[in-house]
Amino acid sequence: MAEPTSTLSTATPAAPRISFVSLGCPKALVDSERIVTRLRAEGYELTRNHDGADLVIVNTCGFLDSAKAESLSAIGEALAENGKVVVTGCMGAEPEQIRAVHPSVLAITGPQQYESVLDAVHQAVPPKHDPFLDLVPEQGVKLTPRHYAYLKISEGCNNRCTFCIIPKLRGDLVSRPLNEVMREAEKLVAAGVKELLVISQDTSAYGVDLKYAESRWKDRDWATRFFDLADALGDLGAWVRLHYVYPYPHVDRVMELMASGKVLPYLDIPFQHASPTVLRRMKRPAAQEKTLARVLAWRDAVPDITLRSTFIVGFPGETEEEFQELLDFLDEAQLDRVGCFKFEPVAGAPANALENPVPDEVKAERYDRFMLKQQAISARRLKRKVGTRQQVIIDSVTPGGAIGRTKGDAPEIDGSVKIASRRPLRVGEIATVKIEAADAYDLIGSAVGF
């Protein structure tokens, strides 16, 4: 877990100390930030050491068996080092699985149950709060570095993909009103955040549940809609990066915001597959047969757009012909950044009941072929950047330079730029870098313009 960015530790020496472990996706990280912010507001101090804490909170992931194993391991480690552990998050929706392995945990709550987490903490370690001494930053306590932040715009999902249990864990789509999201975003930017990463389970469905109701922001009524939110965020002066976007037709409108520079020319779109028959078995939303045409149209509208996606190979019933359709799609779409997963059954997912499961050795072979093809595509696309000048946000400083990311790279999941510089660069600074070399995933360059 990253060090919380609140450096104001003015609580009394006797303030209870909480150690926090956050596992899983960025949506879970935002949940962790909300809990941590409430704890700091109540006078609790945060520590990274379990053995020096009065209590440990573990925010779990329960999407895949491997994630559950990691969560159970983290709980066991916390129990061994501390003994007082509160468990929350997606795996908390199945408390019997946790109790079977770790019966001594103090409490288990499901995802988004912030009040239940706080109640459990209060019972185990009552707060010692002095509102005149304790101070929490207005933007809340963040678990990311200071210069970027995840902005969660909704909870839950209305889709019913057969490989996924997110609706079971987190419920149907619940969008936050646009003015509420904008107030949070404005506070983050005022606190020094240079990059806002917009996240949800289905970002392009934002506002559907509210029937796109209008809300007041900056003397104007804005619809609670994907395009309107992106447009409003683009006025804040920070990089705006859009994640978990489904290829619905209305996403086309966002191209004008990218072309004008209001939001980054970047889309994270979880295609998952390209074969129409596999997609039907997956029950994926959107008109997938038009996806390739849409990708090509986006590239025409915004030539420098970066498209990232994730795919699943070895889905039940996947034939060699269907897998070849996926490889052909990679050739035609020429995506910039791609992740791939071998299908893994998730307890409670309808896909588990589908016929003709793919043998593990076939999954592994297809995964290797997929990654080899995409690696070559990514390398060719990055090579095009050699000789160009790119705006790069600095993530860390190194002797004689820094490590950063272009507008086409999200933190943690995409590539980076290794930068040589004659002057010191600062974390969070946006520098102009001349790209001098590239490999399959990363760039090398020199800072210019000084």
UniProtKB/Swiss-Prot annotation:
GO biological process: tRNA modification
GO cellular component term, pick one: cytosol
Domain Radical SAM core: 143-380
Top EC class for this record: transferase
Keywords: 4Fe-4S, Cytoplasm, Iron, Iron-sulfur, Metal-binding, S-adenosyl-L-methionine, Transferase
Domain TRAM stretches: 383-449
Annotated catalysed reactions: L-aspartate(89)-[ribosomal protein uS12]-hydrogen + (sulfur carrier)-SH + AH2 + 2 S-adenosyl-L-methionine = 3-methylsulfanyl-L-aspartate(89)-[ribosomal protein uS12]-hydrogen + (sulfur carrier)-H + 5'-deoxyadenosine + L-methionine + A + S-adenosyl-L-homocysteine + 2 H(+)
TM stretches of this protein: none
Cofactor: [4Fe-4S] cluster
GO terms, molecular function: 4 iron, 4 sulfur cluster binding; aspartic acid methylthiotransferase activity; metal ion binding; protein methylthiotransferase activity
Database matches in PROSITE patterns: MTTASE_N, MTTASE_RADICAL, RADICAL_SAM, TRAM
Binding site for [4Fe-4S] cluster 2: 157, 161, 164
Stretches of the chain forming a coiled coil according to its record: none
Ligand binding ([4Fe-4S] cluster 1): 25, 61, 90
Protein name as catalogued: Ribosomal protein uS12 methylthiotransferase RimO
